[in-house]
Amino acid sequence: QTPFYFSMSVSDVFSTILTGATFYIIPKMYFSFPVKLIEFLEEKKVNTIYWVPSALCILANLGALTTDNLKNLKKVLFAGEVMPTKQLNMWMDKVDAMYANLYGPTETVDICTYYIVNRRLSNDESVPIGKPCDNCDVLIVKEDNTLAQDGEAGELLVRGSFLASGY
């Protein structure tokens, strides 16, 4: 859960309002008690979560996920950290939902790319950051400031109207 003083809370709050959904604030202590956290999600019939991967990993690593719980959960969105593939696969094995990796550095104020996870990834594979969001352009440039070709390494540059002032 994003603190309200952090820019990411804007998308949490307003996307909930826009879709006519209910916004629940999960008591922070529940993240220390996975069974209580799952009970809360089930009791409230939560259908979408947008968490940092470390929160998702807590439930996966402690074996709190089963094929019998979280039946209402339809979307699992994650951002802010690298999602370990092993734990992502643990989620995908137990919870039938749409999974999406959302990427956006601080200067974009929100996400700039997304990847819908549509297959099981091998444990040594990285979760891709995906495609640019609407109103966003993503470029990869080499050290000589020329555009990188597919498969070439380089620096990720983002442009769009949502960049923070000064970028």
Which residue ranges define each predicted feature?
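Short hydrophobic "strand-cap" motifs at the C-terminus of beta-strands
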Residues: Q1-T2, I26, W51-V52, L62, ...
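AMP-binding (ANL) adenylation modules
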Residues: T2-F6, Y30, G104, T146-Q149, ...
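Conserved AMP-binding/adenylation subdomain of ANL enzymes
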Residues: P3-N47, R119
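Conserved A3 ("GATE") glycine/threonine-rich loop of ANL adenylate-forming enzymes
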Residues: Y5-M8, N47, G80-Q87, N101-I116, ...
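A generic "structured core" feature
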Residues: T16, G20, T48-I49, L59, ...
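Active-site loops of AMP-binding adenylate-forming
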Residues: L18-F23, A64, D93-D96, T106-S126, ...
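Short gly/Ser/Thr-rich phosphate-binding loop of adenylate-forming enzymes
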Residues: F31-K36, P53-T66, K75-M98, N135
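AMP-dependent adenylate-forming
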Residues: A97-N101, I116-Y167
